[in-house]
């Protein structure tokens, strides 16, 4: 279903692997989302400052520089309303608990389907 400009939800995708980031971005755009891309945690935080109306942030955990857990903490310190979804290959229970305790609303492990991703972002 295509969205009108008024309905379009802005989503930040933080993923350092370009092929995975492209897969996520293509599928979200096909679903009608306005997507902002970031390759590092620092870049993601800067893009969120530039785009304060972002509704959802998809965060990988394993990144160069600051990791996704720290990005999540920093986002939550300044924005309690944005939806945060950890999107990672790390599937251990402790990682999931850490993600949720740092402020994530959801935790999705790779691999995932485009349909699952879109359903969680909605």
What do these predicted ranges mean?
Residues 57, 61-62, 90:
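The short loop immediately C-terminal to the conserved phospho-acceptor aspartate in CheY-like receiver
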Residues 22-30:
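Charged docking surfaces used in two-component/phosphorelay signaling
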Residues 15, 63:
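Conserved acidic carboxylate
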Residues 37-56:
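Acidic, metal-coordinating helix/loop segments flanking the phosphotransfer/catalytic sites
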Residues 64, 92, 110:
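The feature encodes the CheY-like receiver
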């Amino acid at each position: 279903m295509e969205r009108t400009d008024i309905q379009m939800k802005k989503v930040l995708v933080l993923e350092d692997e370009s092929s995975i980031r492209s897969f996520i971005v293509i599928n979200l755009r096909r679903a009608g989302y306005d997507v902002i891309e970031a390759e590092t945690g620092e870049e993601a935080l800067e893009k969120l400052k530039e785009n304060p109306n972002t509704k959802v942030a998809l965060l990988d955990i394993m990144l160069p520089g600051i990791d996704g857990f720290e990005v999540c903490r920093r986002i939550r310190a300044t924005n309690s309303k944005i939806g945060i979804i950890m999107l990672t290959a790390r599937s251990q229970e402790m990682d999931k608990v850490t993600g949720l305790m740092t402020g994530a609303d959801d935790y999705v492990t790779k691999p995932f389907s485009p349909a699952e991703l879109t359903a969680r972002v909605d």
